[in-house]
């Protein structure tokens, strides 16, 4: 494993992967990049247990749909942190972000992980980093209340 400086990517890395995206792996002389593609490949190629993805095509499709739904969370997150609008509009943006998180709170009502109770799976690993990033909103907008608080999102906060 090689850590790559994302601001100043080494020449060899950009030559290997012109998109410059991470994570990137070289497997069987082929370059693969993007988190989901890399994780899917590793899950299929290496015989590890437990698998990140379920065996059933239907369950895999549900994961892909949930990831597509999570794009709304990501969009609202970036809209909020990049905004220079007045507080009233920031509050509206924050509410949109919180509303986009609500379906994910509901998915966790009866289980510990999106994958179930036995441990995290692909969906858990793909969206977890975004929950860490939510704390950054307060750095950009100190007067805005915490985005993901335990009274509104007890399951997601625990997750």
Predicted regions and their residues:
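GST-like domain detector, emphasizing the conserved glutathione-binding G-site
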Residues: 1-119
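General N-terminal targeting signals
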Residues: 16-18, 48-50, 69-70, 137-139, ...
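Extended, well-ordered alpha-helical scaffold segments
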Residues: 92-96, 147-159
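Short basic/hydrophobic patches in alpha-helices and adjacent helix-turn junctions
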Residues: 106, 133-136, 158-159
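GST superfamily/GST-like fold recognition
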Residues: 117-142, 148-154
């Amino acid at each position: 494993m090689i850590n790559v400086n994302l601001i100043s990517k080494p020449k060899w890395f950009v030559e290997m992967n012109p998109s410059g995206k991470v994570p990137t792996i070289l497997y069987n002389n082929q370059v693969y990049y993007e988190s989901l593609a890399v994780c899917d490949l590793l899950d299929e190629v290496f015989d590890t247990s437990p698998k990140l993805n379920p065996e059933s095509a239907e369950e895999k499709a549900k994961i892909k749909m949930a990831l597509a739904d999570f794009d709304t969370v990501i969009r609202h997150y970036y809209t909020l942190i990049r905004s220079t609008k007045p507080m009233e509009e920031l509050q509206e943006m924050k509410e949109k972000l919180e509303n986009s998180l609500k379906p994910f709170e509901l998915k966790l009502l009866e289980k510990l992980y999106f994958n179930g109770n036995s441990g995290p799976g692909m969906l858990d690993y793909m969206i977890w980093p975004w929950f860490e990033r939510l704390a950054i909103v307060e750095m950009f907008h100190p007067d805005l209340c915490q985005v993901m608080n335990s009274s509104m999102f007890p399951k997601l906060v625990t997750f």
